[in-house]
Amino acid sequence: MSEGDQELRALMTRYQGGSLEAFQEIYAQLAPGVRRYLSHLAPGSEVADDLLQETFLQMHRSRAAYNPTYAVRPWVFGLARNVFLMNRRAARRWAAVHESREDLPEFPVLPEADRLGSQDEIRRCIAHLSPDQAEALLLHHEWGFSFEEIAGMLGITAAAARARASRGMADLRVALNNLQRARA
């Protein structure tokens, strides 16, 4: 367990006991990454901001159920994913939101992809991956979650998370190489 994990677990335990300062520190540490993740899932800053607020509201409501043996960061990212999925189901039901994977917001690029194309090209290529591949790829390579943590967030096995990320990276490499050849 990393020092950051231990600190977040201690903060969460204090938050469960009613510490507002502990919540503020958890929010300060996790909100930027959770927002980037939600921006990937739900393009459009206004929607991502709303989902971020809903995620931390859900964390507040669920704080008593939090198990201190589980890492806080993947737990909160899992809450964010669930909030996104509930929002998407509601949007489909009411036809209120039209999503476009082409309008992904800015986000840091994958380290090895940086030399293969511009951020816009990489974004377009990621947008054409299957949603499962793109999500696993970004959770692992961009946000640094282990395959076990991804498995817990997505409700799949660690092997399935690894396979999705691996296939996504392979498809991304092919797409970026095709773009490079087309430019040459």
Spans of model-derived segments:
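DNA-recognition helix of helix-turn-helix
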Residues: 81, 85, 125, 133, ...
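Short, charged helix-capping/linker segments at alpha-helix termini
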Residues: 2-3, 16-25, 35-54, 158, ...
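Amphipathic, Lys/Arg- and hydrophobic-enriched alpha-helical face
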Residues: 26-45, 62, 126, 177-178
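Structural recognition of an alpha-helix C-terminal capping motif at a helix-to-coil junction
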Residues: 50-57, 70-82
